[in-house]
Amino acid sequence: MKSGKFQTKGFKFKQFCIEGGESGMPVSTDGVMLGAWMESPSPAHILDIGTGTGLLALMCAQRFPDAKITAVDIETTAVEAASHNFSHSPWHDRLSVQHTDVLIFSPPQRFQRIVCNPPYFNTGEQAKQSQRATARHTDSLRHDALLKCCYQLLDAEGKASFVLPITEGELFIELALTQGWSLSRLCRVQPSEKKPVHRLLFELAKQPCDTQESHLIIHSSDGYSDDFVRLTHEFYLKM
């Protein structure tokens, strides 16, 4: 996947590799946490919205051996990277990627689970690199439209999992509740014990339900916390 253009740094996990190509989308801790934290029935059809390099789809394929995963992205370079990563994974027969805007995506079936690391820069200048600007600037996929789209793509018992910074996450959840969603799971994430919550992992359900709440601290005084290691050890090489 080499060319004269900027190449995004790759990343090796225990069972698969991520090559970023020209996507401008490096592997993020947010994405790894979400992929490790989300839950899914088995078997299931899972949709990864805004797949980027395919990280979440690949994590789902590893965790849920009976699931079929469809990934969509609007960026050509992202689709190229995801397609490469899928084809070189052990689960290539259960993974597919489509170059499309999810707002016009019309699949033949509904999904039991959706996973998405949404864009969240609501203000300020767009990122200098155009692909990352598309990946992270809310104008490319507004949250209200994303929620309505997810609601239509899920089956009646379906759920959708997301990760966002705390301010954007609280606004996203508030908006979801006004649209008829229920908050089924919520995990507040702190970078360390002495730092405040900076991320929310959350799951939305179409059916009424109670909220299961939890808490995660990423770093302890001597490295990653035991909880973070337990969550991600199936993926990171050195855990």
From Swiss-Prot:
Record-level Gene Ontology MF annotations: nucleic acid binding; tRNA (adenine-N6)-methyltransferase activity
The UniProt entry, under InterPro entries, shows: DNA_methylase_N6_adenine_CS, SAM-dependent_MTases_sf, Small_mtfrase_dom, tRNA_Adenine-N(6)_MTase, tRNA_adenine-N6_MeTrfase
- The answer to whether UniProt assigns keyword S-adenosyl-L-methionine to this entry is yes
Question: Got a GO cellular component term for this one?
Answer: cytoplasm
- List S-S links within the chain: none
Q: Which reaction does it catalyse?
A: adenosine(37) in tRNA1(Val) + S-adenosyl-L-methionine = N(6)-methyladenosine(37) in tRNA1(Val) + S-adenosyl-L-homocysteine + H(+)
Keyword Cytoplasm set for record: yes
**What's a Pfam family in this record?**
MTS
Q: Name the UniProt key words of this record, in alphabetical order.
A: Cytoplasm, Methyltransferase, S-adenosyl-L-methionine, Transferase, tRNA processing
Q: EC number(s) of the enzyme?
A: 2.1.1.223
Per the record, the GO terms for biological process are: methylation; tRNA processing
Compartmental location: Cytoplasm
Function, as annotated: Specifically methylates the adenine in position 37 of tRNA(1)(Val) (anticodon cmo5UAC).
Q: Which family does it belong to?
A: Belongs to the methyltransferase superfamily. tRNA (adenine-N(6)-)-methyltransferase family.
Q: What is this protein called?
A: tRNA1(Val) (adenine(37)-N6)-methyltransferase
**Which species does this protein come from?**
Vibrio parahaemolyticus serotype O3:K6 (strain RIMD 2210633)
The lineage, from the top, is: Bacteria, Pseudomonadati, Pseudomonadota, Gammaproteobacteria, Vibrionales
